Structure formats: structure tokens, C-alpha cells
Amino acid sequence: MADTMQFDLVSPERNLVSVPVREVRLPGADGDLTAMPGHAPAIVNLRPGLVTVVAGDGSETEFAVTGGFAEINNESVTLLAERGHPRAEMTQEVFNEMMAQARRRVEAAKERESAGEELVAAAVKLLADMEALGTHIGLDPNHANFPH
């Protein structure tokens, strides 16, 4: 079995990273998971959270994602994120924009007469996951600059 696997993280705005890694820790919609070389093939839905990339030398790099999905196989992980930023770029301003978008999704879901409870619940869960992400990385999910 190889010591590393290929990891690619892509968002609509840009290709964030393409590197060989020892492991990738992902915020799966059904729970966190770690992909390593030799992993069984899987497609995983992601919730907002941190993706941690562990290089061959053990150094770690984190990326904040707002959701998406990952394709995992025995020699690579390809993550397609709705939005993604290196943790170092996650300023309060960037996080405020992400939270405002999540709040708009909740309001839009509530306003649709035909929206089922599942759609509203999914939007509310997205907002809660975004708040948890911000708290985890030291950003204020209740910052006063949010448009309500």
C-alpha cells in the first residue's frame, strides 16, 4: 500500500489544493471520517466544517468548506466544495458573508409555501453547521454585521 494518496479540493471559485497526502479528515454529513491510502471507494456528502489535510511529513493544513461532496478511492480523494477557503483566509468578513448566505437559504425555505418541513429543516441544519464551524475556528457567528 502506498504511503500517500492524491488530494484535490475544488470550489466554483478556484482550485484550492492538489497535493499528495497521508490522510484527509472530512466533515461528512453523517459524521466525520478519515480517508487514507487504500480506502474503500465511497461518495460522501459533506456538511459545513473543516477539512484537515495531513501531508507525508505529518504537517496539517485546514480548509473551511460550506458543504459539497467527496469522491474517495484507494489512491485519491477529490472534494468538490460549494465554497471553500484555506483556514488562514477565513476572516470575520468572509465568514459573515457565508453566514448571511446560509441565513438567506433558511428564509427562502421558510417563505416558500410549497416548501416541505424537510427543506426547512435542511436549511436550518446548514445554518447550525455554519455557526458551529465559525465557533470552532474562533469566528463569531453572531457578529453584528449580519443582514437579517
Swiss-Prot record:
Entries under Pfam families matching the protein: ATP-synt_DE_N
Q: Which Gene3D superfamilies match?
A: F0F1 ATP synthase delta/epsilon subunit, N-terminal
Membrane topology of this protein: Peripheral membrane protein
Q: Which UniProt keywords apply?
A: ATP synthesis, Cell inner membrane, Cell membrane, CF(1), Hydrogen ion transport, Ion transport, Membrane, Transport
Q: Where in the cell is it found?
A: Cell inner membrane
Q: Which GO terms describe its molecular function?
A: ATP binding; proton-transporting ATP synthase activity, rotational mechanism
* Gene Ontology cellular-component annotations: plasma membrane; proton-transporting ATP synthase complex
Listed InterPro entries: ATP_synth_F1_dsu/esu, ATP_synth_F1_dsu/esu_N, ATPsynth_dsu/esu_N
The family assignment reads: Belongs to the ATPase epsilon chain family.
Q: How does it assemble?
A: F-type ATPases have 2 components, CF(1) - the catalytic core - and CF(0) - the membrane proton channel. CF(1) has five subunits: alpha(3), beta(3), gamma(1), delta(1), epsilon(1). CF(0) has three main subunits: a, b and c.
Recorded hits in NCBIfam families, A to Z, give: ATP_synt_epsi, PRK13443.1
Stated role? Produces ATP from ADP in the presence of a proton gradient across the membrane.
Q: What is this protein called?
A: ATP synthase epsilon chain
Source species: Paracoccus denitrificans (strain Pd 1222)
Specify the taxonomic lineage. Answer: Bacteria, Pseudomonadati, Pseudomonadota, Alphaproteobacteria, Rhodobacterales
Gene assigned in the entry: atpC
